[in-house]
């Protein structure tokens, strides 16, 4: 439900969503991994391949396609199925990037510092060099990082404010982030153990 007081927020979020799709569509992914097996995995998934029941029939990157986690490719292939434009699958990088910015800002909002510093620090947290260099590609390290930031921030906010919304964001970030690559399972697992 859109109330009068959160209409500007909805407009900003919708604009960022549209931006994510448009910028992903017009910027071609020229990364090796992106072209070699991430996009091929998405094509296989779009064409009905179920990695639980069978091996892919891919001719390129078969080892990586069949054996690596497919969290990012699954999300991207859903976008690809919806739009029929493979490059638009990269919009998940932008969406996760914006989510990490807003989650960081939400945590920094709890501190007694100037608003401009909160925005600056949230920007620096979300838009770090790895994220900036990978947001236009199907590389997945930036996506792991963005989900980890969301996971960390949502747990901080949940412990501070006790709102279930933050717990749901934490669980979603944890599940999505840990399904992207094998090392992300370790990263998120260590985080959970340290809680």
Feature names for model-found ranges:
Residues 130-144:
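Short acidic/glycine- and proline-prone juxtamembrane loop motifs at membrane-interface regions
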Residues 110, 151-166:
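Membrane-interface transmembrane helices that cradle and orient dolichyl/undecaprenyl
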Residues 27-41, 47-75:
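Extracytoplasmic catalytic/substrate-binding loops of multi-pass membrane glycan-assembly enzymes
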Residues 1-23:
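Start-transfer (signal-anchor) and selected internal transmembrane alpha helices
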Residues 71-92:
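Juxtamembrane segments of multi-pass membrane glycosylation machinery
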Residues 155, 166-182, 188-193:
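Membrane-interface alpha helices of multi-pass inner-membrane proteins
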Residues 88-112, 150:
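Transmembrane-helix motifs of polytopic, lipid-linked glycan transferases
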Residues 120-126, 153, 174-178:
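Short helix- or helix-capping micro-motifs
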């Amino acid at each position: 439900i859109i109330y009068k007081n959160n209409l500007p927020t909805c407009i900003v979020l919708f604009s960022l969503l549209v931006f994510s799709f448009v910028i992903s569509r017009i910027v071609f992914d020229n990364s090796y991994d992106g072209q070699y097996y991430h996009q091929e995995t998405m094509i296989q998934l779009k064409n009905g391949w179920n990695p639980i029941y069978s091996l892919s029939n891919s001719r390129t990157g078969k080892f990586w396609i069949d054996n690596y986690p497919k969290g990012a490719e699954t999300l991207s292939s859903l976008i690809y199925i919806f739009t029929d434009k493979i490059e638009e699958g990269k919009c998940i990088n932008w969406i996760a990037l914006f989510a990490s910015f807003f989650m960081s800002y939400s945590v920094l909002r709890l501190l007694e510092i100037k608003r401009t510093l909160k925005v600056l620090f949230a920007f620096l947290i979300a838009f770090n060099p790895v994220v900036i260099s990978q947001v236009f590609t199907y590389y997945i390290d930036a996506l792991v990082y963005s989900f980890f930031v969301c996971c960390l921030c949502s747990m901080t906010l949940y412990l501070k404010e006790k709102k279930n919304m933050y717990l749901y964001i934490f669980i979603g970030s944890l599940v999505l982030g840990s399904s992207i690559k094998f090392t992300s399972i370790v990263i998120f697992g260590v985080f959970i153990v340290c809680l």
